[in-house]
Each structure stands twice: as structure tokens, then as C-alpha cells.
Amino acid sequence: MNQRRRTQAERRAETRAAVLESACRLFGNKGYADTSLDEIAAGSGLTIRPIYHYFGNKVQLFAAVNEAMEERIVASLQANAADAPKDPILSAWRNFLELCEDSEFRRIVLIDSPNILGRERWAESPVTRMAAALLLEYRGNMDQRSAEIAGRMIIGALSEAALTVAESDDPASAARAAEAIAKRVSAALLQAGQAE
């Protein structure tokens, strides 16, 4: 049987994907500090050398994992926003909370990322830019700078609420309480955007 040989680019992409998958699983389950590059290499069925080749070091590998998670957030929020024209902020909150039910996602994005990559990174993240764009699109007269600041505030509030819900003894009750607050915040932003 004559099978087509994979190209160098295909092999590289597969290797990179295997490392990212292993890193995501281990960073998500054990956390950044308790995960070694040797474990990631073993989990991907490779030696440690490809990790250094493709990612440079552990921090850069973690940044790539975090970026993949951010892309997941943006894709999910974009798909959801199209279905929720009435109140996209509340809809985004619900969607984000669903993503945060995944313990790997929560550990990487909400717990380790701010500590490893720095909080200031959020200011330029695609998630914050999307939140600001949502505010500009749906919140009337809010100017660009106000939307950026509000976007960062919303991301911070959503992240903290998601952690609170996840750590609660009664997550369902905590989620309902957080959603009630999110409704009030969304309504207040709507009023503020119309008043400016």
C-alpha cells in the first residue's frame, strides 16, 4: 500500500500539537509550578529537545498554552455573541462561566496565568479586546478608552466570579448569585453607555 509521506511542516505541526496537548493537560491538572518539562515531554511521547526547539523554555510553553486557551475563549464568545443580540454581556458571562467549569481551563487561565505571565498581559489579550469591542458595539455612546477600561474591569470581575463559583461549597447557588450581579452590572453599563 502506497501511503503519502507527511511533509516536514505536517510533522512539525503534529509535534507542536502533541507538546501543547500534554502541557495543557499537565499544567491544568498539576499547575505550572508542579509540572516539569520532562513530564510534558514524556506525556507527549517525545524527548525534551522538541520543547526547547519549538517553545524555548517553560514560560514560553506556558504562554503558548495560555494563548490556545484565550483563542478558545474568543471563539466561544464570538459564536455565542451572534446568538445573543439582546444582552451580549450577560450571555458572555454565562458562556465564560461554562468554560470555567473545566478545571484545566480554570487553573491555566485564572490561577496560573496572572502569576506566571503577569496581569498586565490581559490589557492586550484578545479576550479583553473582544470585551471592549462588545461594549463599543452594544453600549451606545461609550468612547474607546472607556470601553477598554470597562472591558478590563469586566474580565477581572468575571474571572473572580468564576473562581468564587468554582471554589464554592454550593456552586449552583453561587452561580445564580453571580448571574444576578452580572445582570445588574450589564444593566448599569447599558445606562452608562447611553448617558455619555
Language-model-detected regions and their locations in the chain:
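Amphipathic alpha-helical segments used for helix-helix packing
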Residues: 99-119, 132, 163
